[in-house]
Amino acid sequence: MEQYLSLFIRSIFLENMALFYFLGMCTFLAVSKKVKTAMGLGVAVIVVLTISVPVNQLVYANILAPGALGWAGFPDTDLSFLSFLTFIGVIAALVQILEMTLDKFFPALYNALGIFLPLITVNCAIFGGVAFAVQRDYTFTESIFYGAGSGAGWALAITLLAAVREKLKYADMPEGVRGLGSVFMIAGLMALGFQSFSGVSI
């Protein structure tokens, strides 16, 4: 259990998807204007990553990997060239299910997220989490913890950025750094702050 907890914490702080790998920056910058919306998208990313990472790991290990189809009588078959297409297809299906669920039960959040909800399908943070888990050959259980941790890390980062941006609305900032200029600087400073965790041994 300790190794799973270590993997979970490491994926939140040491290998943060947004502030270490700089993945998912399009939605990270665009949806971080309000804390409530940022938290909603963060929860959606956590759900999608927690499900899509282990599901795609299972698909790769049992169908796509070289020799994975030995159980079906095709030990020499290698379908790994279909990995990217398969991963995106699984992610798209999960996002579609999530979108329909939010539209049905949480219409206010669905309307607040707008176009960015279907864009989770092509959010490179989601795909990056899946690709990293497969590349590092995580087990199914490790994939669950890694997916949840990666999603939580991304959600934490966008929520913190949104909180700072809400405060900055009342700040008297120089003309040249208003808008996205200040957001890039804040994101950079946050990334530097998260880099301080790199010296921690977990």
Curated annotation (Swiss-Prot):
This enzyme catalyses:
a ubiquinone + n Na(+)(in) + NADH + H(+) = a ubiquinol + n Na(+)(out) + NAD(+)
For whether the record's keyword set contains Lipid metabolism, the answer is no
- Its predominant location is membrane
Location relative to the cell: Cell inner membrane
- The EC number(s) given in the record are 7.2.1.1
Region forming the signal peptide: none
Top enzyme class, one word, equals: translocase
**Topology versus the membrane:** Multi-pass membrane protein
What's one GO BP annotation on this UniProt entry?
sodium ion transport
**Annotated keywords:** Cell inner membrane, Cell membrane, Ion transport, Membrane, NAD, Sodium, Sodium transport, Translocase, Transmembrane, Transmembrane helix, Transport, Ubiquinone
**Pfam families associated with the record:** Rnf-Nqr
From the record, what ranges are coiled-coil? none
Q: Name one GO cellular component term.
A: plasma membrane
Q: Which domain of life is it from?
A: Bacteria
The GO terms describing molecular function are: oxidoreductase activity, acting on NAD(P)H, quinone or similar compound as acceptor
Give the transmembrane region(s).
11-31, 39-59, 79-99, 114-134, 144-164, 180-200
Q: Which family does it belong to?
A: Belongs to the NqrDE/RnfAE family.
* Biological function: NQR complex catalyzes the reduction of ubiquinone-1 to ubiquinol by two successive reactions, coupled with the transport of Na(+) ions from the cytoplasm to the periplasm. NqrA to NqrE are probably involved in the second step, the conversion of ubisemiquinone to ubiquinol.
**Subunit and interaction comment:** Composed of six subunits; NqrA, NqrB, NqrC, NqrD, NqrE and NqrF.
Protein name, UniProt field: Na(+)-translocating NADH-quinone reductase subunit E
Species name for this entry?
Answer: Pseudoalteromonas atlantica (strain T6c / ATCC BAA-1087)
